[in-house]
């Protein structure tokens, strides 16, 4: 079964991170990711969402977009918080950023109009 792009929009609350983690884990499993890669991606989404929620205290919603690629998954997380202070100073040297970089194949801070976000790439390897 082909995995289509998925979009999940939830209120910007930390108690909903488990829902984001479950969705990304399910889609990664359907794409044939190994258990370790699924766990890395699940933890990366949790870390990225926590990072965004901490930086955007004025956020009212958190958006997760997952798109399959020929080599894995592209994951975009964003909030509707004002972007004037995004990215936070030193964000690319923070512990959260180091964790994201270790768990994914690519992590990028994104500013796009009225949103602030993160773009993550996780390449798949056959489960086994």
Whereabouts are the PLM-identified features?
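Bergerat-fold GHKL ATPase/HATPase_c domain
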Residues: 1-43
């Amino acid at each position: 079964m082909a995995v289509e792009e998925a979009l999940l929009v939830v209120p910007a609350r930390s108690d909903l991170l488990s829902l984001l983690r479950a969705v990304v884990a399910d889609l990664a499993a359907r794409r044939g990711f190994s258990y370790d890669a699924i766990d890395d991606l699940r933890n990366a989404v949790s870390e990225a969402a926590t990072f965004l929620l901490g930086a955007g205290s004025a956020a009212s919603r958190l958006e997760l977009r997952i798109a399959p690629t020929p080599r894995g998954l592209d994951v975009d997380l964003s909030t509707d918080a004002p972007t004037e202070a995004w990215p936070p100073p030193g964000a690319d040297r923070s512990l959260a950023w180091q964790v994201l970089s270790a768990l994914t194949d690519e992590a990028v801070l994104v500013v796009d109009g009225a949103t602030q976000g993160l773009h993550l790439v996780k390449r798949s390897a056959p489960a086994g």
